[in-house]
Amino acid sequence: MRALLGLLLVFGGCTFALYLLSTRLPLGPRLAAAGEPEGRSLWFPSDLAELRELSEVLREYRKEHQAYVFLLFCSAYLYKQGFAIPGSSFLNVLAGALFGPWLGLLLCCVLTSVGATGCYLLSSLFGKQLVISYFPDKVALLQKKVEENRNSLFFFLLFLRLFPMTPNWFLNLSAPILNIPIVQFFFSVLIGLIPYNFICVQTGSILSTLTSLDALFSWETVLKLLAIALVALVPGTLIKKFSQKRLALSETSDIGHPDRRKDA
């Protein structure tokens, strides 16, 4: 009970801080043009239409308040990652639209790693018993696979990040239970999610620059789409290479779907 109360206290404090950041905005050019008061708040996008609207608002607002937009974006990203809240893919796309393809990619990789490590620490301090209570079978299966691959643990962690059937939120929550060293955990997230982050950020960069259908077929856009396609092939190639040479992976795909496992 004390652990749950501690977690709720931390969550409430972070939620309140993010609320203040998103509702106490300095008046920007777009807000001033619309004649809106300073109490305007921002929101987490839930679909592409909201994402595009938010991107337009923040890009205009960033002209006069670049540091504030950067702080707000980083805070929102770490909030979602730290508390394992779905929807970080929208923020990756937003990063590409706001900061461009390369700065956006660097920012997302760092924030993903820091946020996931924050989730690791929160789980270690407050959530171990909750995770074990709610997901006993998943924890047991993942524990078994971690022990089987303990001698090549870092490559196994990379595999779990690259493998699309493995839920990242569960890996973040269960890692301290499995005695995964925090340094290996951090760098496996930093490296393993580069392809995923690249695809999302490049998508945001493309969407932010399109003004017509003709722009979709420009050489710059075509090259970006080609780069996305090539990067999308990386996880499968790495999985095939490392799974054949170094890892014991017979049941890993069932971690997120225990009902798919066959009876022994």
UniProtKB/Swiss-Prot annotation:
- Indicate the secretion signal residues: 1-17
Does the record bear S-adenosyl-L-methionine in its keywords? no
Task: List cellular component terms (GO).
Answer: membrane
Q: Where is this region: VTT domain?
A: 96-207
Determine the domain of life of the protein's source: Eukaryota
* TM regions (residue ranges): 67-87, 100-122, 153-173, 175-195, 219-239
- State where the protein is found: Membrane
Q: So what family is this one in?
A: Belongs to the TMEM41 family.
According to the UniProt entry, the note on domains is: The VTT domain was previously called the SNARE-assoc domain. As there is no evidence that this domain associates with SNARE proteins, it was renamed as VMP1, TMEM41, and TVP38 (VTT) domain.
Q: What is this protein called?
A: Transmembrane protein 41A
Give the species this sequence originates from.
Answer: Mus musculus
